[in-house]
């Protein structure tokens, strides 16, 4: 039994360390904005910056089909069908 506890402890410890060593991400897992190399950067550095900036913009502006927030989905489901009849109190006015 002590061997099983030690094995479980090592597994838990390694999982925690693996989670702590993840690279930092921006909000909601978005990539970090590339750092401008400065006005005196070489053409190669500027080309690399332009490529990184293009990738960054493409990641932020890509369409996310079917990736709605659960809160938004809950609100939409509460609205009901757009073809449903209006409540009586609204129809009497």
Swiss-Prot record:
List the record's Gene Ontology CC terms alphabetically: extracellular space
Provide the leader sequence positions.
1-29
PROSITE patterns recorded: PANCREATIC_HORMONE_1 (PS00265), PANCREATIC_HORMONE_2 (PS50276)
Q: Where in the cell is it found?
A: Secreted
Q: Output the SMART domains linked to this UniProt entry.
A: PAH
Q: What GO terms are given for molecular function? A: neuropeptide hormone activity; neuropeptide Y receptor binding
Prodomain residues? 89-93
User: InterPro entries attached here?
Assistant: Pancreatic_hormone-like, Pancreatic_hormone-like_CS
The answer on whether this UniProt entry bears the keyword Signal reads yes
Q: Does the keyword Magnesium apply?
A: no
Q: Hey, which family's this protein in? A: Belongs to the NPY family.
Report the record's Gene Ontology biological process terms: feeding behavior; neuropeptide signaling pathway
Highest taxon, organism lineage: Eukaryota
Q: Please give the name of this protein.
A: Pancreatic polypeptide prohormone
At which residues is Tyrosine amide found?
Answer: 65
Query: Which keywords, in A-to-Z order, does the entry hold?
Result: Amidation, Cleavage on pair of basic residues, Hormone, Secreted, Signal
């Amino acid at each position: 039994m002590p061997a099983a506890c030690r094995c479980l402890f090592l597994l838990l410890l390694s999982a925690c360390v693996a989670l702590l060593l993840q690279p930092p991400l921006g909000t909601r897992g978005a990539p970090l904005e590339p750092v401008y190399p400065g006005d005196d950067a070489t053409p190669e550095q500027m080309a690399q910056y332009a490529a990184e900036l293009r990738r960054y913009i493409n990641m932020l502006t890509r369409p996310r089909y079917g990736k709605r927030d659960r809160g938004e989905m809950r609100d939409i489901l509460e609205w009901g069908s757009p073809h449903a009849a209006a409540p009586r109190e609204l129809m009497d006015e």
